[in-house]
Protein backbone atom coordinates (compact mmCIF):
# COMPACT_ATOMS: atom_id res chain seq x y z
CA UNK A 1 0.00 0.00 0.00
CA UNK A 2 1.39 3.45 -0.89
CA UNK A 3 2.52 5.73 1.93
CA UNK A 4 0.45 8.66 0.60
CA UNK A 5 -2.89 9.18 -1.06
CA UNK A 6 -1.44 12.11 -3.00
CA UNK A 7 2.05 13.48 -3.56
CA UNK A 8 2.45 16.99 -4.89
CA UNK A 9 5.37 18.82 -6.47
CA UNK A 10 5.08 22.52 -7.13
CA UNK A 11 5.38 26.04 -5.90
CA UNK A 12 5.17 27.17 -2.28
CA UNK A 13 4.59 30.74 -1.18
CA UNK A 14 2.35 32.98 0.89
CA UNK A 15 -0.31 35.39 -0.36
CA UNK A 16 -0.56 38.91 1.04
CA UNK A 17 -4.08 40.13 0.28
CA UNK A 18 -4.99 43.81 0.64
CA UNK A 19 -8.70 44.70 0.74
CA UNK A 20 -10.67 47.93 0.39
CA UNK A 21 -8.45 49.64 -2.14
CA UNK A 22 -9.73 52.41 -4.43
CA UNK A 23 -10.89 51.37 -7.90
CA UNK A 24 -8.18 53.50 -9.51
CA UNK A 25 -4.58 52.87 -8.55
CA UNK A 26 -2.96 56.22 -9.13
CA UNK A 27 0.80 56.22 -9.74
CA UNK A 28 3.16 57.76 -7.19
CA UNK A 29 0.51 57.83 -4.46
CA UNK A 30 0.33 55.94 -1.22
CA UNK A 31 -2.95 54.04 -1.17
CA UNK A 32 -4.55 52.85 2.05
CA UNK A 33 -6.09 49.39 2.41
CA UNK A 34 -8.97 48.76 4.83
CA UNK A 35 -7.60 45.40 5.93
CA UNK A 36 -5.13 42.69 4.98
CA UNK A 37 -4.41 39.02 5.47
CA UNK A 38 -1.30 36.91 5.06
CA UNK A 39 -2.26 33.37 4.13
CA UNK A 40 -0.94 30.22 2.50
CA UNK A 41 -0.75 30.78 -1.24
CA UNK A 42 0.23 28.89 -4.39
CA UNK A 43 -2.06 26.38 -6.02
CA UNK A 44 0.04 23.33 -5.15
CA UNK A 45 0.27 24.24 -1.46
CA UNK A 46 -3.42 25.10 -1.24
CA UNK A 47 -4.34 21.73 -2.80
CA UNK A 48 -1.99 19.94 -0.37
CA UNK A 49 -3.36 21.84 2.64
CA UNK A 50 -7.00 21.26 1.71
CA UNK A 51 -6.57 17.55 0.92
CA UNK A 52 -4.76 16.98 4.22
CA UNK A 53 -7.44 18.94 6.09
CA UNK A 54 -10.01 16.55 4.60
CA UNK A 55 -8.07 13.55 5.89
CA UNK A 56 -5.91 12.55 2.91
CA UNK A 57 -2.30 11.49 3.44
CA UNK A 58 -0.35 14.12 1.49
CA UNK A 59 3.35 14.32 0.68
CA UNK A 60 4.73 17.61 -0.63
CA UNK A 61 7.92 18.58 -2.46
CA UNK A 62 8.98 22.12 -3.16
CA UNK A 63 11.72 24.64 -2.43
CA UNK A 64 11.72 27.62 -0.06
CA UNK A 65 14.28 30.10 1.13
CA UNK A 66 15.79 30.11 4.59
CA UNK A 67 13.62 33.06 5.61
CA UNK A 68 10.49 34.01 7.54
CA UNK A 69 8.15 33.49 4.56
CA UNK A 70 9.56 30.01 3.96
CA UNK A 71 9.22 29.02 7.62
CA UNK A 72 5.67 30.35 7.82
CA UNK A 73 4.68 28.52 4.60
CA UNK A 74 6.02 25.25 5.99
CA UNK A 75 4.29 25.81 9.34
CA UNK A 76 0.93 26.30 7.65
CA UNK A 77 1.31 23.08 5.64
CA UNK A 78 2.53 21.07 8.60
CA UNK A 79 -0.36 22.27 10.79
CA UNK A 80 -2.82 20.77 8.29
CA UNK A 81 -1.03 17.40 8.34
CA UNK A 82 0.98 17.63 5.11
CA UNK A 83 4.31 15.77 5.15
CA UNK A 84 6.92 18.45 4.40
CA UNK A 85 10.01 16.30 5.01
CA UNK A 86 11.05 16.59 1.35
CA UNK A 87 10.66 20.36 0.99
CA UNK A 88 14.12 21.76 0.36
CA UNK A 89 15.14 24.88 2.29
CA UNK A 90 17.93 26.72 0.50
CA UNK A 91 20.31 29.26 1.95
CA UNK A 92 20.89 31.62 -0.95
CA UNK A 93 20.23 35.18 -2.01
CA UNK A 94 16.93 34.01 -3.52
CA UNK A 95 14.12 34.17 -0.98
CA UNK A 96 10.75 32.44 -0.79
CA UNK A 97 8.23 33.72 -3.31
CA UNK A 98 5.31 35.97 -2.41
CA UNK A 99 2.09 36.93 -4.16
CA UNK A 100 0.47 40.28 -3.41
CA UNK A 101 -3.21 40.49 -4.28
CA UNK A 102 -4.75 43.95 -4.55
CA UNK A 103 -8.44 43.25 -4.06
CA UNK A 104 -10.94 45.78 -5.40
CA UNK A 105 -14.74 45.63 -5.41
CA UNK A 106 -15.12 43.82 -8.74
CA UNK A 107 -11.57 42.88 -9.79
CA UNK A 108 -8.07 42.30 -8.46
CA UNK A 109 -4.43 42.72 -9.39
CA UNK A 110 -2.16 39.74 -8.72
CA UNK A 111 1.57 40.46 -8.43
CA UNK A 112 4.01 37.62 -7.84
CA UNK A 113 7.64 37.67 -6.82
CA UNK A 114 8.82 34.24 -8.01
CA UNK A 115 11.79 33.80 -5.69
CA UNK A 116 12.50 30.12 -5.05
CA UNK A 117 9.42 29.05 -7.07
CA UNK A 118 11.29 29.37 -10.36
CA UNK A 119 14.33 27.51 -8.99
CA UNK A 120 12.64 24.19 -8.11
CA UNK A 121 14.72 21.72 -10.10
CA UNK A 122 14.96 18.04 -10.98
CA UNK A 123 17.68 17.68 -8.35
CA UNK A 124 15.27 18.92 -5.65
CA UNK A 125 12.88 16.02 -6.28
CA UNK A 126 12.88 12.58 -4.70
CA UNK A 127 11.18 10.46 -7.38
CA UNK A 128 10.67 7.46 -5.08
CA UNK A 129 8.88 9.72 -2.60
CA UNK A 130 6.63 11.15 -5.33
CA UNK A 131 5.81 7.68 -6.68
CA UNK A 132 4.84 6.35 -3.22
CA UNK A 133 1.22 7.48 -3.63
CA UNK A 134 -2.03 6.63 -5.34
CA UNK A 135 -2.02 9.96 -7.20
CA UNK A 136 0.65 12.45 -8.24
CA UNK A 137 -0.23 16.13 -8.70
CA UNK A 138 1.93 18.78 -10.37
CA UNK A 139 0.72 22.34 -10.58
CA UNK A 140 1.76 25.71 -11.97
CA UNK A 141 4.28 24.20 -14.36
CA UNK A 142 4.50 27.56 -16.12
CA UNK A 143 6.12 29.01 -12.98
CA UNK A 144 8.58 26.14 -12.53
CA UNK A 145 11.21 27.54 -14.90
CA UNK A 146 14.06 25.19 -13.87
CA UNK A 147 11.92 22.05 -13.72
CA UNK A 148 9.81 22.69 -16.84
CA UNK A 149 12.16 21.10 -19.43
CA UNK A 150 12.17 17.80 -17.51
CA UNK A 151 8.48 17.56 -16.63
CA UNK A 152 7.81 15.04 -19.45
CA UNK A 153 10.32 12.71 -17.74
CA UNK A 154 8.65 13.21 -14.37
CA UNK A 155 5.11 12.26 -15.25
CA UNK A 156 5.60 8.73 -16.67
CA UNK A 157 7.94 7.82 -13.81
CA UNK A 158 5.46 8.98 -11.19
CA UNK A 159 2.75 6.39 -11.83
CA UNK A 160 2.09 4.19 -8.83
Language-model features, listed with the residues they occupy:
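Conserved beta-strand and immediately adjacent loop positions that scaffold enzyme active sites
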Residues: 99
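Short acidic/glycine-enriched loop/turn segments that link adjacent beta-strands
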Residues: 94-96
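Proline- and acidic/polar-enriched loop/turn elements at helix boundaries
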Residues: 63, 89-90
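Ribokinase/PfkB-type carbohydrate-kinase core domain
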Residues: 1-14, 76-89, 102-160
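Glycine-rich phosphate/adenosyl-contacting loop at the front of the ribokinase-like
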Residues: 1-63, 68-82
Amino acid sequence: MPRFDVTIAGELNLDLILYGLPEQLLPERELIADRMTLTLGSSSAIVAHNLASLGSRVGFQSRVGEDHLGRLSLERLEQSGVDISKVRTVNSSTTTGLTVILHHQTWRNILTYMGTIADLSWEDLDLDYLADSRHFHLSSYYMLRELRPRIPELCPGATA
